[in-house]
């Protein structure tokens, strides 16, 4: 034996689990898909774009960061909870390193169920993947904002407002996410 193993080690996750087959998101906040996207606006410049999308209402929360660490993703939970007009009870993530460690611990502290996808299955996170395409096409490809993080986050926050309150969504019968929430979930707290 040469000590080399062809088997990959399985990463143990203390809190995150696979989403049960029967788990359905019935109300806003039941399942929020979170993912990161590398945005390269200029040669040699990489920005980590975090997106959270509620699968019921299509409400999005977006933020840019200079790093794709678990600590940055954990800070994004504060942004998500402050900007979403509903409590978040479940988050679905891919197996990226930014969603381990501090992020997982923070979800556990907050009582948020954390579901991790099997490797190489982005189609199972389809809502947030589609949201990232929209943000790329309708924000990053047309924006004139500077790509310094504070200025970019201010522009992203305005884009998020437009996306959630002005831009109609075909999947919601051409309502905005805010109109959808007001029509179908009028009891939710307002952001």
Name each model feature, range by range.
Residues 1-53, 71-75, 86, 191:
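Mobile-element integrase/transposase regions
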Residues 7-24, 101, 110, 121, ...:
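C-terminal domain-tail junction helix/linker
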Residues 36, 55, 67, 95:
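Residues immediately flanking
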Residues 52, 127-136:
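A structural motif
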Residues 62-86, 90:
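Active-site beta-loop-alpha junctions of metal-dependent nucleic acid enzymes
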Residues 67, 113-117, 137:
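Basic nucleic-acid-binding interfaces
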Residues 90-95, 109-127, 143-147:
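RNase H-like polynucleotidyl transferase catalytic core
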């Amino acid at each position: 034996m040469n000590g080399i193993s062809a088997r990959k080690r399985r990463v143990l996750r203390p809190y995150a689990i696979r989403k049960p087959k029967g788990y359905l998101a019935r109300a806003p906040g039941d399942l929020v898909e979170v993912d990161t996207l590398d945005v390269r606006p200029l040669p040699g410049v990489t920005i980590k774009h975090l997106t959270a999308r509620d699968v019921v209402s299509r409400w999005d929360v977006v933020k840019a960061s200079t790093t794709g660490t678990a600590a940055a993703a954990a800070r994004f939970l504060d942004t998500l909870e402050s900007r979403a007009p509903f409590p978040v009870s479940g988050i679905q993530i891919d197996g990226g390193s930014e969603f381990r460690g501090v992020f997982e611990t923070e979800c556990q502290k907050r009582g948020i169920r954390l579901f991790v996808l099997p490797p190489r299955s982005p189609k199972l996170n389809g809502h947030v993947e589609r949201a990232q395409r929209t943000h790329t096409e309708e924000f990053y490809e047309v924006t004139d904002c500077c790509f310094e993080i504070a200025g970019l986050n201010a522009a992203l926050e305005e884009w998020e407002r437009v996306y959630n309150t002005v831009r109609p969504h075909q999947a919601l019968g051409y309502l905005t996410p805010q109109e959808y929430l007001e029509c179908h979930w009028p009891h939710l707290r307002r952001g």
